[in-house]
């Protein structure tokens, strides 16, 4: 039984989700860009076999990432940390305290970031056809070519406007083993997942994906699966994840395609179910104090403080300091951080989109401006 579509609120964005199945634990499914929570269950799309299998032994929470499917549109400037926090918002709305998180494709790095950021909310991680970094660099040769991707982004609108069959071609590329019924259903899902403009915006945002630095902070049971002949996400991406997440189990399947058809999904689904049941049985779900925490440490100080204090005098300088303190406190509340060591040292777990490292304190009445210098860094 699948619930009606519901909405979680993440900041000011509404995130569509559905819940299905029952079981001793929850699974949160984080899809790729081709997502639509209603069509995914109502049409014979290839991944429907996944949802039905997961719902046979667990409670499944499936959502559309912001900018896709039935969720709100997204600003092209939205960073991965903000998008990642949608997972937490959906879990809260669905009443899920802890869950196994399954990330598909570009939902994978979001899931990995969530697991590192919220070790108290995720007890297991499964990554399918995922990547640690989107673009290719000398130290990461498996990513996409940025110039080619930008060229493809520029032609998205024209391609979808003049070649509607392109979506069916994309469905065949993604799922070469699919039946005609599955291919047509998948093309329909792609068509309803995003408008051409939204697809271009999401592709631009994905160019910034790089979670390599957070992988060592993942300390929960992790399974990484990848098809050897994945045409969309080169297999080196999966191998990298398997090598750089501590204790991860890596399973490489000698298959074609990015998405398995219902007929070929058996081995991967068996591996995922066995992994989750085993991790659950071993007590991975039990809460424990994490030995590593992913956090951002932010230091602030007012540039030229001595000169400002002299120029303003004690009373006005105290007002400026109070304005600085209030501004910083508001940012901490906004991003769920906490204050450490008076006003100079601020610590927050990476719970939301990172606080921009440019806070300014203004003396509006006197027309003066004191700049606030910040220094930040991640600690894991």
Predicted segments with their positions:
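Catalytic NTP-binding/metal-coordinating core of nucleotidyl cyclase/transferase enzymes
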Residues: 285-366, 375
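Conserved alpha/beta-hydrolase catalytic His-Asp/Glu region
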Residues: 159-205, 214-215
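Short beta-strand/loop motif that positions the catalytic acidic residue
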Residues: 218, 224-226
């Amino acid at each position: 039984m699948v619930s009606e579509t519901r909405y979680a609120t993440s900041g000011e964005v509404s995130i569509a989700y559905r819940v299905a199945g029952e079981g001793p634990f929850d699974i949160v499914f984080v899809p790729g860009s081709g997502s639509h929570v209603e069509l995914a269950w109502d049409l014979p799309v290839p991944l429907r076999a996944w949802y039905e299998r997961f719902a046979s032994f667990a409670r499944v929470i499936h959502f559309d990432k912001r900018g896709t499917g039935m969720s709100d549109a997204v600003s092209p400037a939205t960073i991965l940390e903000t998008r990642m926090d949608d997972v937490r918002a959906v879990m809260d709305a669905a009443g899920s305290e802890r869950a196994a998180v399954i990330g598909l494709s570009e939902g994978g790095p979001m899931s990995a970031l969530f697991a590192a950021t919220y070790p108290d909310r995720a007890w297991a991680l499964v990554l399918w056809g995922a990547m640690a970094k989107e673009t290719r660099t000398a130290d990461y040769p498996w990513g996409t070519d940025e110039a080619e991707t930008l060229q493809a982004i520029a032609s998205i609108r024209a391609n979808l406007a003049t070649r509607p069959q392109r979506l069916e071609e994309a469905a065949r590329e993604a799922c070469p083993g699919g039946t005609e019924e599955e291919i047509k259903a998948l093309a329909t899902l792609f068509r309803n997942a995003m408008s051409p403009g939204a697809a271009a915006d999401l592709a631009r945002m994905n160019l910034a994906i790089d979670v390599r630095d957070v992988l060592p902070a993942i300390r929960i049971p992790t399974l990484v699966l990848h098809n050897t002949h994945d045409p969309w996400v080169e297999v080196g991406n999966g191998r990298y994840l398997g090598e750089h997440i501590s204790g991860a189990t890596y399973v490489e399947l000698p298959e074609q395609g990015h998405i398995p058809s219902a007929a070929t999904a058996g081995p991967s689904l068996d591996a995922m179910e066995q992994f989750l049941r085993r991790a659950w049985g071993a007590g991975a779900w039990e809460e424990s104090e994490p030995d590593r925490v992913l956090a951002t440490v932010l230091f602030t100080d007012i540039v030229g403080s001595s000169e400002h204090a002299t120029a303003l005098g004690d009373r006005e300088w105290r007002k400026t300091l109070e304005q600085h303190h209030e501004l910083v406190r508001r940012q901490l509340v906004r991003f769920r951080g906490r204050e450490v060591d008076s006003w100079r040292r601020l610590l927050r777990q990476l719970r939301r989109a990172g606080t921009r490292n440019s806070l300014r304190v203004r003396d509006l009445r006197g027309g003066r401006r004191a700049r606030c210098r910040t220094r930040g860094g991640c600690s894991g």
